[in-house]
Amino acid sequence: MTTVSMRDMLQAGVHFGHQTRYWNPKMKPFIFGARNGVHIINLEHTVPMFNEALAFISNVASKKGKVLFVGTKRAASEAIKESAISCEQFYVDHRWLGGMLTNWKTVRQSIKRLKDLESQSVDGTFDKLTKKEALMRTRELEKLEKSLGGIKNMGGLPDVIFVIGADHEHIAIKEANNLGIPVVAVVDTNSSPDGINYIVPGNDDAMRSIRLYTQSVAAAAKAGRGQDLAVQAEQDGFVEAE
């Protein structure tokens, strides 16, 4: 099972919150104290809470569940994309489009358009167009890929969303809440933990912290998927034995 230790978190700077004047009082239970005007997060809480979240994600993946990684602020976007791809899951790393979950029917049409344009770009259709038309379609393709590339193969709503930066991604969290989709989120001292099923109190700005979270979630999803594949192989073997 994937777990993260106190040492891992200390080395990654997970315990450094925001300046005390920007705090959200709802995060008080998770704050150890303050140092040089910066809140220090109590890792005695964060370690077990994150490991519980990892176990949940692993369990979702073990049942062929879909994990959607969400992190659109600059510090998080690259790690979000890399980690989601590494475990063959899904991601939103550019901008959360309103209705991405709650208006899935419309999003699905945009994904279909994206896939059509991808086909046209490789089957020679673009070559038959005027330069201007080809350029317009190329731009449309790039725009759709940027917004929807990480979810184009999701094939339906996710079973859990994993969020870096609860404040920044409040629309995604609200949409998941409306649909009853569980939310795992890293929540810094300036953010609200409301609407989050698995709260991970921690630094949501430092690259090292963000990579620790995203890589751990990817490892948990991989481990869960491995269990699923092992069970499948066992069942397949059982059928062959008959």
UniProtKB/Swiss-Prot annotation:
Keywords: Ribonucleoprotein, Ribosomal protein. The keyword Ribosomal protein applies. GO terms for biological process: translation. GO terms for molecular function: structural constituent of ribosome. Disulfide bonds: none annotated. The keyword S-adenosyl-L-methionine does not apply. One of its GO terms (cellular component) is cytosolic small ribosomal subunit. InterPro entries: Ribosomal_uS2 (IPR001865), Ribosomal_uS2_bac/mit/plastid (IPR005706), Ribosomal_uS2_CS (IPR018130), Ribosomal_uS2_flav_dom_sf (IPR023591). Belongs to the universal ribosomal protein uS2 family. PANTHER family: 30S RIBOSOMAL PROTEIN S2 PROKARYOTIC AND ORGANELLAR, SMALL RIBOSOMAL SUBUNIT PROTEIN US2M. This is Small ribosomal subunit protein uS2. The lineage of its organism: Bacteria, Pseudomonadati, Pseudomonadota, Gammaproteobacteria, Alteromonadales.
